From Swiss-Prot:
One of its GO terms (molecular function) is DNA-binding transcription factor activity. GO terms for biological process: L-arginine biosynthetic process; protein complex oligomerization; regulation of arginine biosynthetic process. Belongs to the ArgR family. GO terms for cellular component: cytoplasm. It comes from Salmonella paratyphi C (strain RKS4594). Regulates arginine biosynthesis genes. HAMAP family: Arg_repressor. This is Arginine repressor.
């Protein structure tokens, strides 16, 4: 089996185990993965995977402290580049709309507001995962749209 295919299989198995919400230690996760045929797995690899996928320890329904994945996919982490938090950018005759990962809209809006009128931004309104951006005087909505695309390195 190819290395990348084996890695994808490991990631699927790892995520499936965490969804069970019954593992209270990294050692338990290592043993469960080894039982599934991942002989080369060790505690340090499990630790790195827990960090990579944003796993946290929380109480399950039985009030036991267990590892689990965040409820929302796409939750921002300290290592998320901002451009990865922007999912979609679109516009109409009046406004540019930016869709972000859940919880990231206010962070992205603050960045856009800090760029200000020099970049064509009059202001932003942010919810949890959606931002409305208004163009400043002298800028068209299309100009603002293209500037934001360039900022977040998105494709037209």
């Amino acid at each position: 089996m190819r290395s990348s295919a084996k890695q994808e299989e490991l990631v699927r198995a790892f995520k499936a185990l965490l969804k069970e919400e019954k593992f209270s230690s990294q050692g338990e996760i290592v043993l469960a993965l080894q039982d599934q045929g991942f002989e080369n797995i060790n505690q340090s690899k499990v630790s790195r995977m827990l960090t990579k996928f944003g796993a946290v320890r929380t109480r399950n329904a039985k009030m036991e402290m267990v590892y689990c994945l965040p409820a929302e996919l796409g939750v921002p982490t300290t290592s998320s580049p901002l451009k990865n938090l922007v999912l979609d950018i679109d516009y109409n005759d009046a406004v540019v709309v930016i869709h972000t990962s859940p919880g990231a809209a206010q962070l992205i809006a603050r960045l856009l507001d800090s760029l200000g009128k020099a970049e064509g931004i009059l202001g932003t309104i942010a919810g949890d995962d959606t931002i409305f951006t208004m163009p400043a005087s002298g800028f068209s909505v299309r100009d603002l749209y293209e500037a934001i695309l360039e900022l977040f390195e998105q494709e037209l």
